[in-house]
Amino acid sequence: MNRVEQDGLKIDAGLHRFLVEEAMPGTGVDPERFFSAFSDLIHDLGPKNRALLVKRDELQAKLDGWYRDHGAPVDMDAYEAFLKEIGYLLPEGSDFSVSTANVDPEIATIAGPQLVVPVMNARYALNAANARWGSLYDALYGTDAIPDAEGAERGKGYNPKRGGRVIAWARDFLDASAPLSSGRWIDATSLAIEGAALTVTLANGAKTALAMPAQFAGYSGNAAAPSEIVLRKNGLHVAIVLDPTTPIGKADAAGIADIILESAITTIMDCEDSVAAVDAEDKVLVYRNWLGLMKGDLEEQVAKGTTTFIRRLNPDRIYTASGGDKLTLPGRSLMLVRNVGHLMTNPAILDREGKEVPEGLMDAMVTALIALHDIGRNGRRANSRSGSMYVVKPKMHGPEEVAFACETFTRVEAALGLPANAMKMGIMDEERRTTVNLKECIRAARERVVFINTGFLDRTGDEIHTSMEAGAMIRKGDMKQAAWISAYENWNVDVGLECGLSGHAQIGKGMWAMPDLMAAMLEQKIAHPKAGANTAWVPSPTAATLHATHYHRINVSEIQNGLRSRSRAKLADILSVPVAARPNWTEEEIQRELDNNAQGILGYVVRWVDHGIGCSKVPDINNVGLMEDRATLRISAQHMANWLHHGIVSEAQIVETMKRMAAVVDAQNAGDPNYQPMASRFDESIAFQAALDLVLKGREQPNGYTEPVLHRRRLELKTKQRAA
């Protein structure tokens, strides 16, 4: 690897060239000053970063010892006293309210879906950014949200019966979201603007209006025959597209060709769990796509059938407001960026001692440099109109680590000439020590926090690893019914509201991991806004459009106001450890648990290691496609490691299961010409060996994280490929 030495840093030449020739021009940043400040950041804060990781290990060792002596806690008072004694559970200070300023309404006041996408993949990133608006007709027609039964099957051509059910569903949605003062939307025959109001003519010839006229936001085209009508509910917009020249519009009595919903209000462009970025080559790709998003010039050639086209960021949507003025609605999702956490280092840059630098420090400096194209002195203000950069920080353990992230942001702001607190922080509440100290974590970032989120997947992985020595854990599928998890979900909302996040920040809920099961999502995920969350994660733009309907039905602000008087969830419930009271499962139940975990691990790891794909839809043992990333991998690997440690299964049984399920995964990937089977070459397959490492060496992984094994094995494969 060629390196450029500058200010005590040894920087990969490709990364250095990217920074100087691509990222810096147009920002007003002087390269000499940038690298000097970057070096100071690395050498001043690197030792602090490493010390925080040592503290994690020290606390884990004390927990391991306690559990070996006592097992799962029964006397919760004694257990809490121990956690306080070792500095795991910290004193809670006085009440306060966050004071985060200059927050865009998409985060502060608008409730709606949130996408998380690997920024390493330009097509996914563009699709997500453009998912601010989505066709309700397409989302319903193309998914199981509309049943295939009784002649309404999806096929290659248009099925009018299915289309009729889509239209009926959408009209029912309009009746609920923007009811008419009389009549129903299904009976509309024409729409027009008269004065500053929307007039709807019904099939019986009667004219009606909106029951709440203020819901009419604007239109495009001619007032007497508009091409679009824009309505508003709970801060979200709906565009009714009128076009009788299209097949759908021609068959519709009112000429309605589609209903477009404001969908993914925010999107996290992810540099972390959904990407596989292990070296400078990978990091440059991550940063280059983020640069394209911030400059607005990211594009990707997309092939559909025999045609190709260029996908770019969508422009804003321009309308005439109800009062006659110009109405501009954002055409793109507000973008946050998720940096990596405090754990990993990256060989892209070495410090003056030759050590790999903490990747979180590198991400902070470089992603903020790139964000200057949007929020700097010469910035476009096309993403954040409020001049803020939104950084999600994952996998932090407690307030000391949050404070360290804040210190990092302060240093980066000074280096880049940004105003104080321009870098906002999203706190992933996905580690147990952060959960139990959440109020103090928020206090540490009270001038920056714009987001807290329950990442129940990683949080479950940490739950298992933290209490690894306490006993055999309950089955993975039973975790969602465990006492700790419901208390954790409620605690996050309770503490967030106590700290004044409402109106300043998002209180988020986790991912719907089954992208093909949209009917189930429509039925179940409404629970998230009902629980007081003003955002929740969805796996696709289509899912965002369907989930957006929930925020029309539920006024989250009203829900949050009602929850303020609720007693906070019980700490004792959160601290309860999900060990099996009587681990008396049958051999068949144990083997099925192993098979399911092994298949998920192998299906994800083989794509991560062999192809550098960090987020995959992996079929489970029942052939249901599940979105897998490092968080789901962490659960499965830690669960198998726990059962191995406590003698529920043997190492030989795990190896046999892995080998057998490798053949299943191979068969599921048989249609991929680039896929390398594992089953015929267990010893040679680096991916298979990585999967074994994650389980057989699961107890020794720091906090149960999968990154060290994945990075090492991916680098091993890349080195092997270069040598071939």
Swiss-Prot record:
NCBIfam families tied to this protein: malate_syn_G (TIGR01345), PRK02999.1 (NF002825)
UniProt GO MF annotations: magnesium ion binding; malate synthase activity
Q: What's its job?
A: Involved in the glycolate utilization. Catalyzes the condensation and subsequent hydrolysis of acetyl-coenzyme A (acetyl-CoA) and glyoxylate to form malate and CoA.
Tell me the residue numbers annotated for binding glyoxylate: R338, E430, G455, F456, L457, D458
Q: Which reaction is recorded as catalysed by this protein?
A: glyoxylate + acetyl-CoA + H2O = (S)-malate + CoA + H(+)
Q: What keywords are annotated for this sequence in UniProt?
A: Cytoplasm, Glyoxylate bypass, Magnesium, Metal-binding, Oxidation, Transferase, Tricarboxylic acid cycle
EC main group = transferase
Subunit details: Monomer.
What do the Gene Ontology cellular component annotations say? cytosol
Cystine bridges: none
Q: Name one GO biological process term.
A: tricarboxylic acid cycle
Q: Which organism is it from?
A: Sinorhizobium medicae (strain WSM419) (Ensifer medicae)
Q: Indicate yes or no for the key word Cell membrane.
A: no
The record's Pfam families line, in alphabetical order, gives: MS_C (PF20659), MS_N (PF20656), MS_TIM-barrel (PF01274), MSG_insertion (PF20658)
Binding of Mg(2+), residues: E430, D458
PTM sites of type Cysteine sulfenic acid (-SOH): C615
- Please state where this protein is localized: Cytoplasm
What's the protein here called? Answer: Malate synthase G
Q: Does the keyword Calcium apply?
A: no
Residues the entry annotates as binding acetyl-CoA? V116, R123, Y124, S274, R311, P539
Coiled-coil blocks: none
